[in-house]
Amino acid sequence: MRISESLLRGLIRENLLTEAAMTPTQAGGLGIKFQIRKYPDSAVIYARKEGRDMAMGTLSSSPTGDPCSDAWEIVFSQARIDGLGPLMYDLMIDVISPRPLMSDRIEVSKDAKRVWDYYRDRRGDIEQVQLDDEVNTLTPDYDDNCYQKSAKLHDKGNWTGSSLSKAYRRRGGGRPTFDELQHLGLIEFK
């Protein structure tokens, strides 16, 4: 059996993402602490290294103003250390729980798309919430309507199968990433 070059590259990328995702223990070993600012209409997480003023990572989310099944959207994301981004996404899912988290509705980087693909394809602990578009292509309900530009841009012709057309939350509730980081003394509220 021959594997095409594009399939092989995809498998390598997926494996790198799995290996690259930082654990809470690894973050603690690097001296990273997470500052959380949660408001009724937004949440921001800063990953800071002890002794440094500059954030090693920043992730912010907020409601969109559209129904979107009550999901919050990533509005800014930056990670300066490999593997930190996926850990911060997991933490944001816990911070905004029980609301689901979704990608930026307009623009998503290739790295972020891989994280969302991983949630869709490989995370049994994460529940997927399918979102409709603004014209009720999937359901007659208004509550799940959401702008789908990023899904339609990345997955032309199959936006409903796109990881970007969904929102994500912990299956059965719980906040395991938050709880582990807090247990390790790596959470600060500002």
Q: What role is predicted for each listed range?
A:
Residues 79-95:
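Conserved acetyl-CoA-binding loop-helix of GNAT-fold acetyltransferases
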Residues 78-83, 102-106:
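Short, charged/polar micro-motifs that form catalytic or ligand-binding hotspots
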Residues 1-19:
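Protein-protein interaction and targeting regions used for scaffolding, dimerization, and localization
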Residues 21-28, 33-68, 98-190:
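Terminal substrate-recognition subdomain of acyl/acetyltransferases
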Residues 73-75, 91-95, 104-106:
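Hydrophobic, well-ordered secondary-structure scaffolds
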Residues 70-80:
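Extended, structured, electrostatic nucleic-acid-contact surfaces
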